[in-house]
Amino acid sequence: MAKIGVQSNLSDVQQELQSKGYEVVQIENEQDGQDCECCIVSGRNADVAGISVPGQMSIIHAEGLSAEEIGQRVDEIVTQH
């Protein structure tokens, strides 16, 4: 299953994605997100969180979304790749 990076303060999102079978890694810096299909961050700007992502990696901004909504977006991203 796809590897998904999740900012450490989003434990409900981590649990949702693990229940869907995704490999979840906590991201605290740009190295943590390498090799991930996409990353989920809590704010609008990943750079503010100290996380920069390489190339065309998808970023999901968790602000205002439920864990279930984020899980659906991850499903869409993974099926497109």
From Swiss-Prot:
Residues that span the membrane, as ranges: none
Pfam families: UPF0180 (PF03698)
Stretch forming the signal peptide: none
Domain of life, per lineage: Bacteria
Family: Belongs to the UPF0180 family.
UniProt xrefs under HAMAP family: UPF0180
Protein name (database record): UPF0180 protein ABC2430
Species, as recorded: Shouchella clausii (strain KSM-K16)
